[in-house]
Amino acid sequence: MIINAKGPASFAEKYIVRSIWENKFPPGSILPAERELSELIGVTRTTLREVLQRLARDGWLTIQHGKPTRVNNFWETSGLNILETIAELNPDGFPELVDQLLSARSSVSAIYFRGAIRNSPDEAVVALANINELEDTAQAYADFDYALQHTLAFSSGNPLYVLILNGFKGLYSRVGRYYFSSAEARALAMDFYKQLQQLAIDKNYTDVPALMRTYGINSGVMWQSLRDDMPVELGHSDT
């Protein structure tokens, strides 16, 4: 098992998670005793204990006082915070994971974009006020797009959408930089921003779903033309 890690704790975490992913520690099974596992991985028991607590918080494990540590079915117990980890564990499935991520984000954003322009149209106008000065670079568009999503999610009146969006952040930001490296993708987005801006100015929230649907289809087609050339490095976080 080849694991790239920046320290003992990172190594231990990646070792255990990969072992769960590869079914060496299958769902419902009991982890080896702390002493045995620390010797197997090559870290101190203190470090291992901290890692196990973190993995339990993320839904990989169940820890109960006086009982052995049990492996969970992470698909049932974890949240969006493990997206980065799944991307690293399954590089061959990364393009499909991104497809699913973008599809989910499009479905959810259609709700909070409409909510933002219905409940806080002036905030949407402010968020879109400087689009004509947006630097024509992948980084600038990726940063602006995420900031816009975040602002409108918060302005929708339901802060839970912000938490959902936060779960996408790391992976979405990296994919966004790649997507917006296409001049056509940037032009498509700018056209969308301008139409959205006009709806916000007009306080016309009823037409937002149709605009979101059209942009979702067009950006989806654009993504399909780019996905096969996506660098594998996009699936790796910096940790």
Curated annotation (Swiss-Prot):
Record CDD domains: WHTH_GntR
GO molecular-function term, one example from the UniProt record: DNA binding
A single GO cellular-component term on record: cytoplasm
Pfam families linked: FadR_C (PF07840), GntR (PF00392)
GO biological process, one term: regulation of fatty acid metabolic process
Cellular localization per UniProt: Cytoplasm
Keywords, in A-Z order: Activator, Cytoplasm, DNA-binding, Fatty acid metabolism, Lipid metabolism, Repressor, Transcription, Transcription regulation
DNA-binding region, residue range(s): 34-53
SMART domains in UniProt: HTH_GNTR
Domain of life: Bacteria
Residue ranges of every copy of the HTH gntR-type domain listed in the record: 6-74
Transcription in keyword set: yes
InterPro entries (alphabetical): FA-response_TF_FadR, FadR_C, TF_FadR/GntR_C, Tscrpt_reg_HTH_GntR, WH-like_DNA-bd_sf, WH_DNA-bd_sf
Keyword Nucleotide-binding listed: no
Coiled-coil features, chain-numbered ranges: none
Functional summary from the UniProt entry: Multifunctional regulator of fatty acid metabolism.
Complexes and interactors: Homodimer.
Name of this protein: Fatty acid metabolism regulator protein
Gene from which the chain derives: fadR
